[in-house]
């Protein structure tokens, strides 16, 4: 069996979602003993005890970057994401899923793990022929312009969004360091909500990174 860990993050406000997320994993035969890591974004001692009783490892990641302005602890879910192997060492593959995810079909987990094992990184672009893209360009342009300037925004705003709410990567994938480098440079100048996902997209679209796109 692949040595993997599923990682997410939450604070007390979103703990009820985190509980359902963990239940959706444990409900599958393959997920009953699956390692789970939780980034502590201000969890009470009672909630941490519940997580540990359900087999989860809890980690306060601290701040991984020097930032242009201070943020509340919930922002650690963003700053820790390119650094998961550092916070939960000892695994071959790291699968990140936002805590509002529900694992309905374990086959989806396997697709991410298999994609990462094969190509180093597995992730899903937000693209489909049935999507309505009205307003999409303006949103993307704003994300790129805020963190990376007009030139980058013009170059990448029409590209599909690579969603970092669900991805898997091997511990030694080059993507981690490249993503972290780009994200850190962004945060030194501008801190904003979509910065970590925008940095990942810049990494893919400008550094020639390969992945299994699901």
Language-model regions, residue ranges each:
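Glycosyltransferase catalytic domains, chiefly GT-A lineage
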Residues: 1-214
């Amino acid at each position: 069996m692949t040595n993997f860990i599923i990682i997410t993050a939450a604070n007390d406000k979103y703990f009820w979602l985190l509980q359902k997320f963990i239940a959706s994993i444990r409900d599958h035969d393959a997920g009953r003993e699956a390692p789970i890591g939780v980034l502590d974004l201000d969890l009470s001692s009672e909630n941490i005890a519940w997580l540990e009783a359900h087999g989860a490892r809890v980690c306060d990641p601290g701040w991984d970057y020097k930032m242009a302005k201070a943020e509340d602890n919930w922002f650690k879910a963003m700053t820790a994401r390119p650094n998961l192997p550092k916070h939960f060492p000892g695994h071959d593959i790291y699968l990140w899923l936002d805590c509002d995810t529900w694992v309905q079909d374990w086959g989806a987990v396997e697709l991410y793990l298999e994609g990462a094992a094969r190509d180093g990184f597995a992730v899903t672009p937000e693209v489909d022929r049935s999507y309505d893209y009205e307003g999409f360009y303006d949103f993307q342009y704003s994300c790129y312009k805020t963190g990376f300037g007009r030139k980058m925004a013009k170059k990448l705003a029409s590209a599909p969004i690579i969603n970092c709410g669900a991805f898997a990567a091997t511990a030694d994938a080059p993507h981690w360091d490249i993503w972290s480098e780009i994200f850190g440079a962004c945060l030194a100048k501008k801190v904003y909500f979509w910065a970590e996902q925008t940095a990942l997209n810049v990494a893919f679209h400008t550094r020639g990174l390969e992945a299994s796109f699901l």
